[in-house]
């Protein structure tokens, strides 16, 4: 590129470059194309004069073609030529240079920089470089790669500047067509708004280009890394505008084109802008991105590791990619087929039937609203319960279903409901289409513009969703952090790669922008209501459920750090003092949140409510219990019952509690009755006080086998096994006369407790837990002798095996505070022993503990 004359010493100052063959050199200073071509203080090279002549030659069209309507197709043809030269001409050269080092090889084979060569092309190229760099520039002291890049830059200057100039000519000719049409046929406020917004987009586009060039310099602007590398520039730069959006030169770097279309009020300009932007995205995908991955991307080992992590992620989904919308559809998977049927029914079948049945618009609308409300309430409620109490996970683990199944089945529920909402929304608009859009629209102008913007928003939502899945995988897409502990997942930290580099919550707006697009295309009141429901639900779910759960799991430092957009906004668009103040306020707010003992989340409020319910129970004194149990008429009775084997309560408030016995422990009862009135058919029964307190003198309730005859006037009997209640509560013994249910005496009430069993988190202590369970429960209920005895064989001696399993699961759940279900004992993939059961309980405990672990 042309530059001012430099001294030899200054030429040696600058960044260091290295070719792909290993030669190092000092990279001289270069300038951008605008300064090179239009700054009069910068010397112009031979090719630069030719480029300027080509640019100004476009003005000949205005002189030679007086009819403006004829100029438009001419400039459109020019623009298409230069745009194709850009994306396919430069693209072809860069592709070959990246793959085969083709441009450098051509230079070497043609001896372009060999002063001894007699070819006219070589002499012209050498003269061109001398005119760019100055007469003192020593071509031989620089590698052929750098010199080739200097020549390549001139071709880039010609194509890019011609592309932009011809586009401006298209804009100008379209704007002034039909006597300055862009200023007429609209209300003045609308014209002014259009001009202000259009100029705003152009100014923003200009800022993006300037900021991008200041960040990456000429080296990257002219694709220098296709020819050589700069030392200490081995990583991609994420600063300035590159921290705001991915590939800003190709994304928001073309937003000014749409500003020009808005100013010109021309669909022709809009189509040209879309055409150019579309080709640029193709160039990015097929030329730029492959080279970026080659130069700056991960190594093959890292790529393979990433693929393995993705495959490992699929273990939560039966090792198959789960259905997202209708993507990853598998006709052999029942849930996928059902989703397809439901989507087809709500999107097409119901609207068609409703249309053929007359005006059923209200039915279709309320159906869409009802389904969205159902999805919002059910998904938000389930996520809240899962975050608070691990509701979903507990149910699966208690039934001995693998942890991964909970996430897989949740994914089916979540995706099915989401599919229903979008299918019903589509069905609502399909019905309006079938009816000829008889519903009154809020506005009906600019149909083509509305369709373009609407489709663009729908595409944006699809692209953002795809980018989210690429960044966080299916695990993150389906809220895996709610269901799977961090130690079971490949995601140990929140990702800041992909789209999350620029936005903390990209789905906050872009996750529902497609619904906004539907409203823009069909702006009916019904679509406005649906749009509001989608946006409101999305806001609540992200900010009041997902965000607070992420803080629990990953901590505030990871969740609340500024996104790339926020950093750039603070750095470039607001004063430094205010930016610093905002940062300090954020830190202070985080410190305040750490110091507060109370929480603001929905789940913690629910937790406090449950605790209040537990502590609000009225306590009865021991005397009150005795009075409740015993009739005062028995106080001086000749009949007596003494219960032995009870333990005295040693707790702080023992005055409120009766004596107790551990569940399953034998209870010995001694009776005494008058010999002269004693009958061999007198009997003693065991009852729960809450079931018999309404009748003191006569028992109206069956003892259900928990009784024994008193054949002697005095004696004792031990209640054990099936003659006991195997659940907590307050109980009593009753002495009955002569085979009847007439009560002669009621014993002192006593409590049956389930002893607490501590569950360790260390697998090595599984044997200790197994022995504890064996002694306290299994030896008493099933008569097992060791932790390795089969539970199934011992339970089969009972008349009702399933009832035994239900009883065991209930007792063990209460004792260990780890919920298990009867199905735990029905699995045959491992020996069904107390030892294996203890291992399962420890596993469940570890999972729930890790899910409940809140970062400070």
UniProtKB/Swiss-Prot annotation:
It is an enzyme of class 2 (transferase). This is Phosphatidylethanolamine N-methyltransferase. Pathway: Phospholipid metabolism; phosphatidylcholine biosynthesis. It is a multi-pass membrane protein. Signal peptide: none annotated. Keywords: Endoplasmic reticulum, Lipid biosynthesis, Lipid metabolism, Membrane, Methyltransferase, Phospholipid biosynthesis, Phospholipid metabolism, S-adenosyl-L-methionine, Transferase, Transmembrane, Transmembrane helix. It is found in: Endoplasmic reticulum membrane. GO terms for biological process: methylation; phosphatidylcholine biosynthetic process. Coiled coil: none annotated.
């Amino acid at each position: 590129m042309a530059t001012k004359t430099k001294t030899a010493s200054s030429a040696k100052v600058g960044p260091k470059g290295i070719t792909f063959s290993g030669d190092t050199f000092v990279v001289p200073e270069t300038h951008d194309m605008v300064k090179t071509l239009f700054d009069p203080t910068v010397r112009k090279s031979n090719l630069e004069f030719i480029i300027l002549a080509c640019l100004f030659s476009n003005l000949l069209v205005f002189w030679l073609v007086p009819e403006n309507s004829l100029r438009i197709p001419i400039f459109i043809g020019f623009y298409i030529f230069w745009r194709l030269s850009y994306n396919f001409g430069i693209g072809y050269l860069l592709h070959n240079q990246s793959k085969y080092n083709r441009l450098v090889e051509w230079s070497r084979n043609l001896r372009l920089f060999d002063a001894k060569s007699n070819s006219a092309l070589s002499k012209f190229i050498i003269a061109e470089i001398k005119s760019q760099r100055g007469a003192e520039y020593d071509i031989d002291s620089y590698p052929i790669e750098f010199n080739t890049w200097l020549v390549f830059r001139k071709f880039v200057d010609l194509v890019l500047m011609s592309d932009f100039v011809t586009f401006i000519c298209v804009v100008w000719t379209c704007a002034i067509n039909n006597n300055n049409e862009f200023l007429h046929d609209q209300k003045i406020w609308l014209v002014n708004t259009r001009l202000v917004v259009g100029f705003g987009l152009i100014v923003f586009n200009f800022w993006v280009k300037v900021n991008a060039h200041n960040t990456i310099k000429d080296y990257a602007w002219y694709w220098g890394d296709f020819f050589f590398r700069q030392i200490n520039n081995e990583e991609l730069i994420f600063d300035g505008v590159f921290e705001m959006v991915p590939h800003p030169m190709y994304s928001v770097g073309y937003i000014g084109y749409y500003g020009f279309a808005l100013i010109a009020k021309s669909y022709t300009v809009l189509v040209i802008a879309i055409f150019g932007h579309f080709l640029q995205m193709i160039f990015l995908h097929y030329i730029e991105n492959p080279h970026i991955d080659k130069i700056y991307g991960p190594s093959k080992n890292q790529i393979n590791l990433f693929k393995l992590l993705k495959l490992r992620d699929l273990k939560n989904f039966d090792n198959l990619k789960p259905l997202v919308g209708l993507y990853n559809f598998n006709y052999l998977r029942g849930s996928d087929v059902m989703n397809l049927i439901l989507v087809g029914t709500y999107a097409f079948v119901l609207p068609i039937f409703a249309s053929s049945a007359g005006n059923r618009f209200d039915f279709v609308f309320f159906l869409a609203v009802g389904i969205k409300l159902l999805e919002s309430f059910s998904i938000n409620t389930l996520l809240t319960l899962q975050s608070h109490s691990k509701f979903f996970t507990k149910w699966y683990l208690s039934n001995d279903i693998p942890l991964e199944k909970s996430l897989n089945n949740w994914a089916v529920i979540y995706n099915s409901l989401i599919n229903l909402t979008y299918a019903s929304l589509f069905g609502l608009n399909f019905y309006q289409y079938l009816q000829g859009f008889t519903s009154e629209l809020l506005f009906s102008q600019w149909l083509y513009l509305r369709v373009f913007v609407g489709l663009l928003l729908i595409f944006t939502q699809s692209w953002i969703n795809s980018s989210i899945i690429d960044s966080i995988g299916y695990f993150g897409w389906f809220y895996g952090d709610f269901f799977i502990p961090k130690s079971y997942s490949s995601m140990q930290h929140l990702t800041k790669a992909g789209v999350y580099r620029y936005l903390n919550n990209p789905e906050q707006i872009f996750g529902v922008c497609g619904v906004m697009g539907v409203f823009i295309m069909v702006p009916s009141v019904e679509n406005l209501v649906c749009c509001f429901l989608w946006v409101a639900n999305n806001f609540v779910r992200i900010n009041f459920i997902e965000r607070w759960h992420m803080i629990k799991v990953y901590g505030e430092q990871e969740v609340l750090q500024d996104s790339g957009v926020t950093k750039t906004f603070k750095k470039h668009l607001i004063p430094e003092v205010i930016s610093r103040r905002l940062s300090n306020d954020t830190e202070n707010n985080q410190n305040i949140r750490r110091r507060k003992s109370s929480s603001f989340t929905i789940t913690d409020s629910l937790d406090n409510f449950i605790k209040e319910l537990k502590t609000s129970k009225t306590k009865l004194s021991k005397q009150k219990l005795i009075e409740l149990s015993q009739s005062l008429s028995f106080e001086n009775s000749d009949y007596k019952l003494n219960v032995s084997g009870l333990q005295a309560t040693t707790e702080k408030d023992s005055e409120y509690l009766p004596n107790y016995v551990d569940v399953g422990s034998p209870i010995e009862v001694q009776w005494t009755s008058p010999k002269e009135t004693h009958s061999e058919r007198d009997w003693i029964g065991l009852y729960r006080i809450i079931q018999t307190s309404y009748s003191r003198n006569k028992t109206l309730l069956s003892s259900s086998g928990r009784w024994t005859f008193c054949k002697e006037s005095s004696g004792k009997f031990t209640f054990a096994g099936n003659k006991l209640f195997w659940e907590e509560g307050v109980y009593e013994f009753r002495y009955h006369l002569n085979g009847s249910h007439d009560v002669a005496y009621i014993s002192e009430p006593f409590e049956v407790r389930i002893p607490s069993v501590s569950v360790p988190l260390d697998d090595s202590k599984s044997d200790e837990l197994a022995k504890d369970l064996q002694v306290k429960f299994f030896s008493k209920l099933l008569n097992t002798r060791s932790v390795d005895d089969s539970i199934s064989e011992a339970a089969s001696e009972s008349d009702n095996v399933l009832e035994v399993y239900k009883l065991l699961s209930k007792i063990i759940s209460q004792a260990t505070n780890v919920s298990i279900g009867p199905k735990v004992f029905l699995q045959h993939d491992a020996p069904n022993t107390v030892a294996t059961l203890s291992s399962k309980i420890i596993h469940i405990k570890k999972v729930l503990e890790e899910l409940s672990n809140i970062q400070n």
